[in-house]
Amino acid sequence: LIANKSHTVVLSKEWKQVLESCIGPVHVMNNPVDAKIQPSSVERDRLHLLLLGRNDPVKGHNFGIQVSKKVREVHPQLQVSMTGISTSPHPWLSAKGWIEESEKLHLLQTATLLLVPSAFEGQPLVVLEALTCGLQVIASDRIKSLPEGTIRAPYEDVDAWVSSICQYLKSPIDFNFHTDEFRIAHISEQWGIFYSKCVNLEAQ
């Protein structure tokens, strides 16, 4: 707050549309992606699903396991890695608990597809990190602020998710993700411009 005037920043155009009619002008600022997040020359696994997130019902681990079991009926060699959970009921499911950033990066660089079945997310940084690494994402249609090219599937619709995943595993979809607007240097520059505008506005 400056001189009793608020300067509101949100992470997506969707939240801007929701809030502006209630509180006035809102500025959109993207989450930044760490410069260490880069694609790798290592060949990706052919049948490897990945779910990254804390162990919370909103993140959809149980749903992800249900979907993976069904996908394995078509692709028996499928392997699945999940963070957040520390025990696994299946030999094909690697429950990794909490992991270091270096291991997360390795998973993003080698997995086949990232699952984001969450009930809710703001602007999920893990999606931006995955796309920056060249890893395609399938996400719940409840998540509104997703980059163009992300595969969407209906929330908690097992059959729809299985169909979309199997289709991708059969015929991977190429996508172009413009990473520059999510780089830290660019976001820092945008914050500088925003602060300058706020100060200049108050000086008028």
Predicted features and spans:
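Short hydrophobic beta-strand element within catalytic cores of glycosyltransferases
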Residues: 127, 136-139
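Donor nucleotide-sugar binding/catalytic pocket of nucleotide-sugar-dependent glycosyltransferases
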Residues: 1-38
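Aromatic "clamp/platform" in nucleotide-sugar-dependent glycosyltransferases that forms part
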Residues: 119
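Short alpha-helical donor nucleotide-sugar binding micro-motif in glycosyltransferases
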Residues: 106-111
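Conserved donor-binding/catalytic core segment of Leloir-type glycosyltransferases
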Residues: 33, 41-59, 65-68
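A charged, aromatic-enriched C-terminal amphipathic alpha-helix characteristic of glycosyltransferases
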Residues: 170-203
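A short hydrophobic beta-strand element within the catalytic core of glycosyltransferases
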Residues: 114-115
